[in-house]
Amino acid sequence: MKTREEALALDRDDPLAPLREQFALPAGVIYLDGNSLGAQPRAAAARAQQVIGAEWGEGLIRSWNTAGWFALPRRLGDRLAPLIGAADGEVAITDTISINLFKLLAAMLRHQARHAPKRRVIVSERSNFPTDLYIAQGLIAQFDRDYELRLIDDPADLPDALDDETAVAMITHVNYRTGYMHDMPSVTQTVRQAGALMLWDLAHSAGAVPVDLNGALADGAVGCTYKYLNGGPGSPAFVWVPKRHQRAFEQPLSGWWGHRAPFAMQPAFEPDPGIARFLCGTQPIVSMSMVECGLDVFAQTDMHAIRRKSLALTDAFVALVESRCAGQPLKLVTPRAHHQRGSQASFEHPHGYEVMQALIARGVIGDYREPRILRFGFTPLYTRFVDVWDAVETLRDILDTEAWRAPEFATRAAVT
């Protein structure tokens, strides 16, 4: 792609192009931050009005039954399941990634303590998203026995970090900063052969790249719905537990929604035999209902078509940045190899924060991550090839004119 006309031609031939019309995208904005917060499906506003105005406003408490609120975490989990290689009854939409990670990691450690008590080590990556590491650290602090969080600095170091004391490997499939994507089947096999359990974080994978959790024989996973799945800001996350583990995994947040018969009001907790045991308290129905609007769009295509366009978009973006912005101090930190790349492109720049603020001021919205990383997410449901061209041209102008040096772009916002 060497001209804007070529970009427009690619958009005309794009089989996913009609899906863009199902999103409410503001005029004059090129949105390359769907890896942080997905765009709003047009159906979301009407769905919110239905839930608030009709189901809550008129149905009141009856809507737990008549509008299907009570079954919503499991019903939407079944709708999400095909996107991550899961079966019906294996996914629940609930809580946040952090909370679900606490539940699932604790369940895995408890399982290992019963069957292999010597295994007290959690292996993860130092570059993992911080909340994953914080949750592991906080969980370890709750135990009265010696548990350890062992961090590796390179994916190639994983085999050497696994031993007969490893309980769980907790890995994020696509790295939030660089976009590096692990080989899920290979990593899972390595971990399981070492006798450990494999826990995947799919925050930057679900809805972005094809995932086959059951095919890989993974042991558990968590993920969010507000990024590529377009569920809305703060929309509930999800937890996946394969059926082979559901009865054996006991999570510690034993709230009433995880009880086998919540409305029996029994004084002793008896976990649900299925995925519902990973629920805890009353669910956020309004925000959870919005998740379905994003899933409705995914139902009109498949992950392989999304992946083909994702790779084409990121290939074009990287090539254009390196040609149109040649001579600028930009360093690609995202893998070039397709099998190692998620759906983002990240570049390091000495003044990355200021450059990103200048881009946002001109309507090109990406985001910034420490240290010095310009991060661009590509969401094939609504990102166009002409967006790629125009974004790079804006970046080139900002760098050539040093517009990023304006004082206002150095002011740090609370959210970057």
UniProtKB/Swiss-Prot annotation:
GO BP field: anthranilate metabolic process; L-kynurenine catabolic process; L-tryptophan catabolic process to kynurenine; NAD biosynthetic process; quinolinate biosynthetic process
Catalyzed reaction equations: L-kynurenine + H2O = anthranilate + L-alanine + H(+); 3-hydroxy-L-kynurenine + H2O = 3-hydroxyanthranilate + L-alanine + H(+)
Record keywords: Hydrolase, Pyridine nucleotide biosynthesis, Pyridoxal phosphate
GO CC field: cytoplasm
Principal EC category: hydrolase
Cofactor field: pyridoxal 5'-phosphate
Associated pathway: Amino-acid degradation; L-kynurenine degradation; L-alanine and anthranilate from L-kynurenine: step 1/1; Cofactor biosynthesis; NAD(+) biosynthesis; quinolinate from L-kynurenine: step 2/3
EC number: 3.7.1.3
TM region positions: none
Domain of life of the native organism: Bacteria
Modified residues (N6-(pyridoxal phosphate)lysine): 227
Hydrolase found in the keyword field: yes
Binding-site list for pyridoxal 5'-phosphate: 97-98, 129-132, 172, 201, 204, 226, 256, 282
InterPro entries in alphabetical order: Kynureninase, PyrdxlP-dep_Trfase, PyrdxlP-dep_Trfase_major, PyrdxlP-dep_Trfase_small
GO molecular function (one): kynureninase activity
Family: Belongs to the kynureninase family.
UniProt cross-references to NCBIfam families, sorted A to Z: kynureninase (TIGR01814)
Function: Catalyzes the cleavage of L-kynurenine (L-Kyn) and L-3-hydroxykynurenine (L-3OHKyn) into anthranilic acid (AA) and 3-hydroxyanthranilic acid (3-OHAA), respectively.
The protein's assembly and partners: Homodimer.
Record protein name field: Kynureninase
